[in-house]
Amino acid sequence: MAELTALHTLTAQMKREGIRRLLVLSGEEGWCFEHTLKLRDALPGDWLWISPRPDAENHCSPSALQTLLGREFRHAVFDARHGFDAAAFAALSGTLKAGSWLVLLLPVWEEWENQPDADSLRWSDCPDPIATPHFVQHLKRVLTADNEAILWRQNQPFSLAHFTPRTDWYPATGAPQPEQQQLLKQLMTMPPGVAAVTAARGRGKSALAGQLISRIAGRAIVTAPAKASTDVLAQFAGEKFRFIAPDALLASDEQADWLVVDEAAAIPAPLLHQLVSRFPRTLLTTTVQGYEGTGRGFLLKFCARFPHLHRFELQQPIRWAQGCPLEKMVSEALVFDDENFTHTPQGNIVISAFEQTLWQSDPETPLKVYQLLSGAHYRTSPLDLRRMMDAPGQHFLQAAGENEIAGALWLVDEGGLSQQLSQAVWAGFRRPRGNLVAQSLAAHGNNPLAATLRGRRVSRIAVHPARQREGTGRQLIAGALQYTQDLDYLSVSFGYTGELWRFWQRCGFVLVRMGNHREASSGCYTAMALLPMSDAGKQLAEREHYRLRRDAQALAQWNGETLPVDPLNDAVLSDDDWLELAGFAFAHRPLLTSLGCLLRLLQTSELALPALRGRLQKNASDAQLCTTLKLSGRKMLLVRQREEAAQALFALNDVRTERLRDRITQWQLFH
């Protein structure tokens, strides 16, 4: 075939130029498969085949692609005929060598947007796959506008465009690139302080950090959220590589001349500050926006925490040439270029709402909103883009200046569960998909019917740094109330800090829950708050806030932090306590969810209850209790703790306990 000969010639040219390209095959399954095999036979290479079905040799499922990151391949096939795993697509593109093709298999072009996408099961919170017309139309626009991509459609004439030759490219030899060499020189002579290196993926920041460690005269310690992500760094650091996990490093008295923190923006800020203060020199590296990179706006705020920071950026790719067509196309398709916050939105702010249909009529507006929201966030995944475009129940507000988006709010519908399902969630018998706050209100709260109420959760909110402290965030929340009808509440879940809580409090929210362990992403306890919109919403917020006040002393003692509520010193078991204790004793409610009422039970009961008292009053570890009580593990310890709670309840009032047990055990019969 003449087209295969032309592709063979073009592939050789691409290898000389150090670039990769996308080739789309769109058509019926048989046609796509036949033409892919012809390409594979004509162009020598690895031909890694990413598909949910094992259609060919060298197959890998999208979910297993993570295991191949760090390896390199020549040519690959990405089968998106039944579902488009955007994160896997982005990750695959990063594994391809210079001179490679990424062959993208798509359904018949005209039928694509109406076809259910199997990948939607991961992000839509729907029981069945849904069609994703807005993402498909966006991708079609990108593909048809990209002069460097090749689109080969069934029953359409195929023509290979002439590509203007580029300058020859010379692959890296392992020695530092000129950009790295210059940066290394500056780091080697840096006075005591903190340096930050940011870069997109594939720019060699891990190699740079490893080369620094190998060259310094003194000792360095490496830390990171996950040791697996430091493999490249370790390779370049050689025998001087020494890794210690962040929490273990903080607990130790280790000293070194340099601390190197890989993917520093993913480490909770309070923990990072404590670590940095211990070492004379620190190098922080972070991936900027891209495949699960960090938003540039978040980085501005992050870097501002370190006065006199030396900030550097690597821009030159290492494994392919600058301006690689595949990298450019993937970035445009998955909107990896977030808001860079270089332009200040001017003029008065106007709040307006929009829905997902705007992706069809005016795609630039939701695109800018997404870029602002992802730019302000510490991490954005391609799943977020897919959810914003096509998941049901998504709503948006923008705060527009004269020429730029100054702020944005993303809301998600929640709640409205049936009475039976809400009760089953409260008891711990069921955990349906989605409904983050609505389910938590039931699963961790007092009211078994909490999830029947209908709310709208704040998923993300952002204001341009140059327009902050003008009340724009509060205007967005007020706008959400104005544009929202027939709901019981707005809700928000966030990593608790005093500054964040003051913002939500000024917006009118009521604190209803505080978690009992720190989140890995923020280093903070999770807080949940409600802004009531109906009488039922107001009653729920008041009831849960009252429970939080009763539990405040117990939570403060457990967490080691005072709660921002007025605590109630009330040791008497209430009706709500009895119900919740029965939920722990006879259903599957978690131990720490019931911390407050269990401590009140222990104060009331005269029984020994060693498993409960040991954990909650004496703060013994699970391992210690299992040894003392001769139990085989945590599961058996929890069974014993539930049995002890039941014994204590029966001893206080056997009739009431039996009635509650019978009532709650009925809730697991829900189908």
Swiss-Prot record:
It catalyses: cytidine(34) in elongator tRNA(Met) + acetyl-CoA + ATP + H2O = N(4)-acetylcytidine(34) in elongator tRNA(Met) + ADP + phosphate + CoA + H(+); 2-hydroxyisobutanoyl-CoA + L-lysyl-[protein] = N(6)-(2-hydroxyisobutanoyl)-L-lysyl-[protein] + CoA + H(+). SUPFAM superfamilies: Acyl-CoA N-acyltransferases (Nat), P-loop containing nucleoside triphosphate hydrolases. The record marks 502 as: Important for lysine 2-hydroxyisobutyryltransferase activity. GO terms for biological process: rRNA acetylation involved in maturation of SSU-rRNA; tRNA acetylation; tRNA wobble cytosine modification. One of its GO terms (molecular function) is 18S rRNA cytidine N-acetyltransferase activity. ATP binds at residues 180, 202-211, 319. Catalyzes the formation of N(4)-acetylcytidine (ac(4)C) at the wobble position of tRNA(Met), by using acetyl-CoA as an acetyl donor and ATP (or GTP). It recognizes the wobble base of tRNA(Met), thus distinguishing between tRNA(Met) and the structurally similar tRNA(Ile2). Could use an RNA helicase motor driven by ATP hydrolysis to deliver the wobble base of tRNA(Met) to the acetyltransferase domain of TmcA. 467 endogenous Khib candidate sites significantly regulated by TmcA were identified in E.coli using a quantitative proteomics approach. This is tRNA(Met) cytidine acetyltransferase TmcA. It comes from Escherichia coli (strain K12).
